[in-house]
Amino acid sequence: MKVVFLDVDGVLNNDYTKTYTKSGAEFVDDYLIERLKALITATDATVIMSSSWRYGLTCARHHDDFVELIEKLESHGVHVSGYTPTMNTAHKSVEIKQYLLEHPEIDKFVILDDDEIELFPEQHIETLNRYGLTDENVEEAIKILNKH
C-alpha cells in the first residue's frame, strides 16, 4: 500500500494564497490541490493527514475549518482516508512512525511537509512556504512511490 502523509499549510497553500475559510483562516489553493490529485492518480496512493488541521476532528474551535477543508479536497477528488495519531508531546515524525507501526500494510510512503521530518529523510518531500507543492515535488514523490 502506498501512502501520502499530507501536511496542509505550506503544501496546499503558500505565501501568495488569497483564499480563506469562512472563519477567516488561510485556506488552500485549487491549483495546489490539483497537483496533489495528479500525484495520487499517478501512484494510486492513499492520503493520510498529518497536518495540525486534523485537530478539527476533536476540537470544536477548529471543526468548521476542518470540515471546509475536507469538502474542498473531496470536490477535487482527493479523499483523506485517515489521520496520524495526535500525541501531545510528540513531533510529527513520531506520530507518522506510530501510524506506520499500526499499519504494516504500508510498504511505500512519502511525507509532504514544509517542516523538517527528521526520522524519514528519504521519504520527506520538503515544500517551501513560498511556493507550496511544486511540479518538481510531485515528480520526486512519484519516483519514490513508484520505485520498484
Predicted regions and their residues:
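Catalytic phosphate/metal-binding cores of nucleic-acid and nucleotide-processing enzymes, i.e., regions
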Residues: 1-148
